[in-house]
Swiss-Prot record:
Listed name of the protein: 4-hydroxy-tetrahydrodipicolinate synthase
Family assignment from sequence similarity: Belongs to the DapA family.
Quaternary structure and partners: Homotetramer; dimer of dimers.
Function according to Swiss-Prot or TrEMBL: Catalyzes the condensation of (S)-aspartate-beta-semialdehyde [(S)-ASA] and pyruvate to 4-hydroxy-tetrahydrodipicolinate (HTPA).
Gene that this sequence comes from: dapA
Keywords: Amino-acid biosynthesis, Cytoplasm, Diaminopimelate biosynthesis, Lyase, Lysine biosynthesis, Schiff base
Chief place of localization: cytoplasm
Length: 294
């Protein structure tokens, strides 16, 4: 089971919108040097929904090659067509990803039975261990806890990224799945500390893009049950957690990476560059977190 800080990796792009492969490799190295425990390639923060299939595949392959087995790579393989999600998972397996992260099908709003059958098909046909990804604020499709419990009984479904931010739901998940090998990850940085302290196994984090060492230390403390140290680190990071949500992800974090000199000013429509009025908010949060100097 993977534990700790799992970065939801942004995909660096040039001003033209072209993927910046050299910057992507450097960004992977930045995480290897700063304690990140695992990397999600081409998850939501990586903008796969505005990539071609070939680009999506190439991002996963590039990250796998650069990591070279040093930490686990989780491939973002979600799609709202089950056959496409299976195909993406198969490709991720072929290039050496360790697991896949499969988001609830978006826009078409399946029933709970439809969600169950979708993920069952991905688990059986994709050939990789599957982490479910529940983010109803983006997908309009909510994987209910009871459906998670059903899916957790399937052999190749190994975890859940819960990005609801609902700690009551998280508590039920932890209580029901305690003692199993099923991993529970937060996908909501502002509530991740409490999620882990109640028994979660890690955080699939946007903030880790820019504060990897601090997020590693936070997750390490929280997973170990060190309440005092975890809250101490989290208090310092909370302004950054908040600032990275002032506009839709990954808009603020891509601006932050540019501010840090780790990426060019590149993002793809329909996402746009961070509004001027939020530049100072994100910049000040980076300083408070100790990521940049004033």
């Amino acid at each position: 089971m993977i534990t700790g800080s799992i970065v939801a990796l942004a995909t660096p792009m040039k001003a033209s919108g072209e993927i910046d492969w050299e910057a992507l490799r450097r960004l992977v190295g930045f995480h290897l040097d700063n304690g990140t425990d695992a990397i999600v390639a081409a998850g939501t923060t990586g903008e796969p929904t505005t990539m071609s299939f070939a680009e999506h595949f190439d991002v996963i392959r590039c990250v796998v090659e650069e990591v070279a087995g040093r930490i686990p790579v989780i491939a973002g393989t979600g799609a709202n067509a089950t056959s496409e999600a299976v195909e993406l998972a198969r490709y991720a397996r072929e290039v050496g990803a360790d697991l896949c992260l499969s988001v609830a099908p978006y826009y078409n709003k399946p029933t709970q039975e439809g969600l169950y059958q979708h993920f069952k098909a991905v688990a059986e046909g994709g050939g990789l261990p599957v982490i479910l990804y529940n983010v109803p604020g983006r997908t309009c499709s909510d994987i209910y806890n009871e459906t998670v419990f059903r899916l957790a009984e399937l052999e190749n479904i190994v975890g859940l990224k819960d990005a609801t931010g609902n700690l009551e739901r998280a508590e039920e998940l932890v209580d029901r799945l305690k003692g199993s090998d099923f991993a529970l990850y937060s996908g909501d940085d502002p509530t991740a500390c409490d999620f882990m302290l109640m028994g979660g196994h890690g955080d699939i984090s946007v903030c880790a893009n820019v504060a990897p060492r601090a997020m590693h230390e936070l997750c390490e403390a929280a997973v170990a049950g060190d309440d005092e140290r975890a809250h101490q680190i989290n208090t310092r990071l909370m302004p950054l957690h908040t600032a990275l949500g002032v506009e839709a992800n990954p808009i603020p974090v891509k601006w932050a990476l540019h501010r840090m000199g780790l990426a060019e000013q590149g993002i793809r429509l329909p996402m746009t560059w961070l509004s001027d009025k939020y530049h100072s908010t994100v910049s000040e949060a980076l300083q408070l977190a100790g990521v940049t100097e004033g």
